[in-house]
Amino acid sequence: VELPHPVTGTAFASPVPPGQGWPDDLAAGDTPVACSASDVAALAADASLDQVTACSSVCRACARLVQWREDVASTKRHSFAGEPYWGRPTPGWGDPEAGVLIVGLAPAANGGNRTGRIFTGDRSGDWLFAALHRTGFANQPTSEHAGDGLRLAGVRVVATVRCAPPDNKPTPAERDACSAWLDREVGLLLPSVRAVVALGSYAWTAALTTLGRLGVSIPRPRPKFGHGAEVVLPRVVGAVTLIGSYHPSQQNTFTGKLTEQMLDDVFTRAAAVAGE
């Protein structure tokens, strides 16, 4: 069954096949598909940023995640039953020459897995993009769907794992399989990135691991995560400052553990570090 895209009105199947005109979809019908962790590593090794975006968006390396993301896309949450679900991996998105890189955990089953854009279509994204708008990184305060006119300047958002995982918990093997996409994307962004904001302890650990693999000096013992935690990581040219933030999950925002001001302060600090 094909259903109309909420922004463009074009009809799509769920999951969305590549090359059908979904907003911001860089994949085509002949984009190479990774079916194993070794495939991911091979395809990511010398890919451009656009190629990472395209190839990672059709990845099928992790059977459990493929099954879950596509099952969710087929069954759909009742409130979204009339629209198509992306149902594919959600690639990094934003400024290709960003001074600030935001690292999250994974897309939400009815958020990024539905809309095709990271942190888009759920409460966490509502908080994140509103904060990015208040701090000058986004041209509008909302992110509802790919194609909605949102643009980021000076910042890019990536996920540690690109598929929505059951219970928001990827396995270590799934994290490791996806890490080659993350390593390549971060490596391509590193010439411009001065600040990395990790949303939650999982992203903090992943960011340290990725940066270490890319040649950035990581202190021992490893710096501990905390909201507002900050560590300067030396590299051959300049340094990268890693900044921790509580994840803007409903668990944190509803309870007041994370407030709008706390999130704004993190991005204001990141902007200052990056000179944005």
Where are the regions a protein language model picked out?
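The feature marks either
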Residues: V1
